[in-house]
Amino acid sequence: DIGLNLPQYNSPVIDGVRQATPWVSSPDNIKNFFQTGYSMNHTVALSASTDKTSTRASLSFRDQGGTTPNTDQKRYAMAVNTKMTFNKYIDFDLSANYIRTKSANLPGTGYNSTNALQSIMQWFGRQVDLKDLKNNWDQVDEYGKYTHYNWIQSFHANPYWTLNKNTNSYDRNRFYGKTSLYIKPTDWLKFEGRMGLDHYDSNQFSRILWNIDYPNGYFRSFDRSMTEFNADFIAYVNKNFGDWALNGLAGANYRDYQTAIMGTGADELTAEGLFTVANAHGTPYTLNDHEKRRSNSVYANASIGYKNMAYAEVSVRNDWDSTIKDAFFYPSFSGSWILTETFPGLQNGDYLNFLKLRGGWAKIGSATDPYRSNAYYSLISSSFNGTTLFYNPTILPPTNLRPESVKTWEVGVEANLFNNRLHIDAAYYNKVTSDQIMNANVATSTGYTSMYINAGKISNEGVELQVSGDIIKNPKGFNWTATLNWAKDKSRIDELYTDPVTGQPLDAYQIGSSWSVKNYAMVGKSWGTLVGTGYVYNEDGSILVEDGIPVYEAGKEIGDVTPKWLAGFSNEFSYKDWSFGFLLDFRLGGDIYSVTQAFGSQTGILKHTAEGDLRENGVVLGQNYMTDKVFKTADGKINDVAVNAEDFFYNYYTICEMSVFDGSYLKLREAHLTYNFPKSILEKTKCIKAAHVSLVGTNLALLWVHKSNIAHIDPESTSTGGDDPETAATSRGFNSGVGFESNSYPPSRSFGLKLGVTF
């Protein structure tokens, strides 16, 4: 907007020469790309009952439109619940649910050419007119061939082309339900026989007509199914013995779990737009896999109470799982003591109304994935003289794989004060996770590359606090109730495992990665340490610079992904038939490496690259940029070297620490305004028992983020979508894990109107 004229992608061409046109900004070009999404929910429910039966059936439909063009999702659901009483000894209940979820196009995520935001959030300057790209994305030449109209083709496609021609459809059908038969021979003994089924099948079809990665087309089709069957037999006891009360159960469970997946595809097509295996150019992609596992379990639980003042509970469970050779047993114990019942003198209506102490200890075991404990052979697609070939696995079968173990103990206190207007619940817990199943490298002389072993020990300790108070309480007037939830968890990696190749204890285990930044579990550190290129510091803690540029090294610890604490603060106000409430969420800490911030700074599309006359005066670290930090040369001199802004930001991404931001935030999570219709009005209808109307909003505002979050990215919208077809049902992109962000979609603010009527 300073009077420049430059040849541009959409400038007229005269005699083969692209002409210069005004170099001007396109106001709101990013804002105009997004559209107002919508979600419409419709539910109809019917219920009927007699003295021996009760039934409820419901139908629901949800229609959603995305905030980007040509994205949608529809959800259909049916549910039936019925209960029958044959006589005083026998009851029967049944529940069945069916859900279908489908979409013609789910948007891609992450650093991926299927993500339309990759181009917009990293490469599009303000000069790009998105309206022009929208109007011409399907432009063809005189031969009817697509021109792939775009302002530049070096790294990305026109985002409207991506959303309209490179689509990801999804269709899933799920059925789940259970049925139970109850037999009650006495008033204190009951038996239950229960069967439950959960099944789904889904299809995900990803197609690329053209993009930078696949100029000759691409497709993947995955058909996946899962079936889980559970059968339980349980005996319940509920018996009082004078001042003592016993509640208990004992049961057995049979579980069968199966998954299957079939996939086809091609990385290149012979004929454009024909997404079939027969049209694959070269060897097509095929996948056919399945998993089966079964388990048998016995379990029991007993709770004993004395005079409604003291309680003790014990639970035991033993599992035999097909994925682990040996059975595993895990118990738990807990107890609570209501002091105000034991010592009534403690109760004072004006101060203390209720006081309870509680504590518990538990051990939990978990098995592993199928086929890890034994050797198995994989099919080779080719054959030899008509004979099917198999190959030996590269993973050495473990000799004695044990289940993972989690041991936890907890103590807590609950209190009601000031005529039950103040409620406090506080707890401290300690958790140790050990025998984690990890994939460790082995010497190549064994003929294998790795093996699964039991290793690792992680300790967690934390505090959870809830404080709720009726600040103003007036049954006939204004009321105000506020609730604060606060939680802090501190983790520590105590040990990993001894490397079978080197014989040395391992001090770091990679969890995830994004570009050159890796997330490690490191011994002695909290879970999730980001490692990458980072600053070199002087002895006094200042950052070392040379010629105005920070000196950096690889392999530096540049972040901790674990938040320091989380909090939520809710308020509910009511006055007669009106009520209003809102919820604030707060997170402190939790570092995130942002690819958006790295490349958005390199290309100059982020606001901070042009603030403070940096373009005109250059970047002087510590003076007009990153003024919260101190930069010094090796001889201790304060940095005063101005670096050309274009040169500085072009190399911004090479120092990964510059793109790590503190994930702290304050959010207005939700709010609602409700009106309850008075009974005096409803009585006139003679059929409506209750009715209310509510205006609701969710994810309403990101009120504050840490100053290091210069791209103002929602820390909760970080993308972790993977290539797994079931994961990819909601997002496509690379799976970088916790602590990474790449081209994430801006958070969506939603508003809704709810009408509830009870007949």
Can you describe what each PLM-predicted range is?
Residues V17-Q19, I30, D321, G589-C687, ...:
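Extracytoplasmic gating/loop element in the C-terminal half of outer-membrane beta-barrel translocons
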Residues S11, M40, R75-A77, N81-I90, ...:
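Extracellular/periplasmic, surface-exposed regions of secreted and cell-surface proteins
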Residues A20-P22, D213-N216:
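Flexible, solvent-exposed loop segments that connect beta-strands
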